[in-house]
């Protein structure tokens, strides 16, 4: 099973960490298993609490039901239902920037 390097960045939170995430595990779950505290609420892709923004790489977030096409095109991702499909970099704690 392939895994990918996911870099999680948020200057305000002092976060700049790269973790290995299997391609069948949600990024939020993998981060928590490695002791990284990211925001979340529903864990089902139905709200925006866990929103991040991809600056490099790709994910599969087909389970999400909250983001519209424009937000997805802009790079927003819900980490609670996002599987990595390549090495990627995600700016975390982006909920306020969605609106």
UniProtKB/Swiss-Prot annotation:
Alphabetical UniProt keywords: 2Fe-2S, Electron transport, Iron, Iron-sulfur, Metal-binding, Transport
Q: Give binding positions for [2Fe-2S] cluster.
A: 42, 47, 50, 80
Q: From which organism does this entry originate?
A: Leptolyngbya boryana (Plectonema boryanum)
Write down what this protein is called.
Ferredoxin-1
Its assembly, as annotated, is: Forms a complex with heterodimeric ferredoxin-thioredoxin reductase (FTR) and thioredoxin.
Could you say which cofactors this protein requires? [2Fe-2S] cluster
Q: Which gene encodes it?
A: petF1
Its family remark reads: Belongs to the 2Fe2S plant-type ferredoxin family.
Role of this protein: Principal electron carrier in NADP-photoreduction.
Co-factor: note: Binds 1 [2Fe-2S] cluster.
One BP term from GO: electron transport chain
**What PROSITE patterns has UniProt attached to this entry?**
2FE2S_FER_1, 2FE2S_FER_2
């Amino acid at each position: 099973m392939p895994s990918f390097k996911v870099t999680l960045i948020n200057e305000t939170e002092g976060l700049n960490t790269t973790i290995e995430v299997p391609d069948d595990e949600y990024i939020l779950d993998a981060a928590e298993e490695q002791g990284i505290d990211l925001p979340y609420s529903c864990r089902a892709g139905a709200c925006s609490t866990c929103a991040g923004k991809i600056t490099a790489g790709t994910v599969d977030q087909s389970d999400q039901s909250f983001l519209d096409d424009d937000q997805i095109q802009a790079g927003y991702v819900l980490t609670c239902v996002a599987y990595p499909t390549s090495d990627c970099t995600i700016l975390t704690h982006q909920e306020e920037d969605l609106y």
